[in-house]
Design a protein with these regions (language model features):
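Class II aminoacyl-tRNA synthetase catalytic cores and aaRS-like
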Residues: 1-208
C-alpha cells in the first residue's frame, strides 16, 4: 500500500486534549489505529497516541467519499493523521469524538500482529517480550512508566530543595578498576576501554 506524506500537517492536539469544550473546532491528531468497529453505515476508529485514545467517527452518508474509502483500508496499528471537527456526544466514555474531513495513512503494519493490542485476547509473557514494542503501547504498561516518572521527579525535587545535586558517573572507563567484576571491553576511538559495571567508586569519592 502506498502511504501518504505528512506534508505540511502538524499535530494541534493530543488525544487527552480533545474535550467537549472544543465542540465545533477543527483539530489535527496523529497516532496509531488501536481498534476498528464497522457497523455498516458508521465506522468507529479508536486512535491512540502517547496520551491516550480518541474516537474517530466515520458516517458513510455524511463523511467525504475519499475519507470513507481510505478508512476502509485501515488496519490495527496503522499510523494515521486525522483532520476533522470535534463533536460532543454521550455515546463515548469521554463525551467527545472527531468527525474526519481528511485522513492520511502515514505508515502500515504487517499483519497478522503478534499480539492483540486491544488487550481482549491475553498474551503470555514470552509473546509479550518478543513483541515488546507493541506491548509497551498498552495503557497499562504506559501507566507504570508514568508512575515511575512522577515518583522520580518528586524525589529529585525534594532532594534538590535540600541542596543535593545529581551527578552522572562515567559509563566508559579507561582501565580495569573494578576488582573481580566481569569486564566488557570496547573499542573507543581506537583505544581499549571498558564498560563501567558499578558507580560505587565514584560515589564514594563524591561522598567525601
Amino acid at each position: 500500500m502506498k502511504v501518504d506524506s505528512l506534508g505540511e500537517w502538524r499535530r494541534t492536539h493530543y488525544s487527552s486534549e480533545i474535550k467537549p469544550e472544543l465542540d465545533g473546532k477543527e483539530v489535527l491528531v496523529l497516532g496509531w489505529v488501536k481498534d476498528i468497529r464497522d457497523l455498516g453505515a458508521i465506522r468507529f476508529i479508536v486512535m491512540q497516541d502517547r496520551e491516550g485514545t480518541v474516537q474517530i467517527t466515520v458516517l458513510r452518508k455524511k463523511t467525504p467519499k475519499e475519507v470513507v474509502e481510505k478508512t476502509e483500508n485501515l488496519q490495527r496499528q496503522y499510523c494515521i493523521g486525522v483532520k476533522g471537527i470535534v463533536k460532543k456526544t454521550e455515546m463515548t466514555a469521554r463525551g467527545v469524538e472527531i468527525v474526519p474531513s481528511e485522513v492520511r495513512i502515514l505508515g502500515v503494519a504487517q499483519h497478522p500482529l503478534p499480539l492483540d493490542v486491544t488487550g481482549r485476547t491475553p498474551s503470555d509473557i514470552d509473546v509479550r517480550l518478543d513483541a515488546r514494542v507493541l506491548d509497551l503501547s498498552r495503557q497499562e504498561n504506559r501507566a507504570i512508566f508514568r508512575v515511575q516518572h512522577v515518583a522520580l521527579e518528586a524525589t529529585r525535587g525534594f532532594l534538590s530543595k535540600l541542596g543535593f545535586i545529581e551527578v552522572q558517573t562515567p559509563r566508559i572507563i579507561a582501565s580495569a578498576t573494578e576488582g573481580g567484576a566481569a569486564l566488557f571491553p570496547v573499542d573507543y576511538y581506537d583505544k581499549q576501554a571498558y564498560l563501567a559495571q558499578s558507580p560505587q567508586l565514584y560515589k564514594e569519592q563524591l561522598v567525601i
